[in-house]
Amino acid sequence: MKRIFYILALLAFMTVEKGASAQTMSVATNILDYACLGTFNAELSCPLSRRWSLTAGARYNPFTYRRGDPDRQFQMRQQSYSIGARLWPWHIWSGWWFAGKLRYQEYNTGGLRSPETREGDRFGAGCYGGYTHMLTSHLNLEFGLGLWGGLDVFKCYSCPICGVTLSSGKTAFLRPDDIMISLVYVF
């Protein structure tokens, strides 16, 4: 899966038009993802034309927390990879935008609201929208919301550490995603 992601990203970056050479790339990080139990995240963006950009992003959270007692363990571990495109009605990296993404996520969550833990893999596509406010010629502040759906292949356990399987299977999902307040640096 990672190999396919890298090949698609490489092919997409090779299609960049020469007319969009004033600003060649941006890197962004979603501040709200760090509040999600310390999820590291980054998104690279490359212009395809005046109104289109290609994005590739990743999220990573390896952390497990314990409240002084192994039975009170909780986590929201994940690794997630996405590739997509944004339409900018006015100009790239400024104003309103609409986006679509393909995404893969490997996750393990549990112990937050109940001792039940769920882990698995999600594959899907999403629709996103937002607004980018230019702070300086190289620094932007971005706000956005997203919705993604697809296939979830999962297992549920009775607690984060016991390993007793309650259920497993495949199911379709549709869920909110990418509540964004991002800092974007434009090169």
Where are these regions (language model features)?
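Gram-negative (and chloroplast) outer-membrane scaffold detector with strong preference
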Residues: 46-143, 182-185
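Short secondary-structure boundary/capping segments within folded domains
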Residues: 33, 45-48, 173
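Predominantly the C-terminal beta-signal and adjacent terminal strand-loop region
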Residues: 136-187
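Residues that define the transmembrane beta-barrel architecture of outer-membrane proteins
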Residues: 23-25, 36-40, 75-81, 119-125, ...
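Extracytoplasmic loops and strand-loop junctions of Gram-negative outer membrane beta-barrel proteins
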Residues: 24-27, 66-69, 110-113, 162-168
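Short leucine-rich amphipathic alpha-helices used at interfaces
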Residues: 23-24, 30-31, 111, 117-118, ...
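Solvent-exposed loop/turn segments connecting transmembrane beta-strands
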Residues: 26-43, 61
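Bacterial Sec-dependent N-terminal signal peptides
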Residues: 1-25, 183, 187
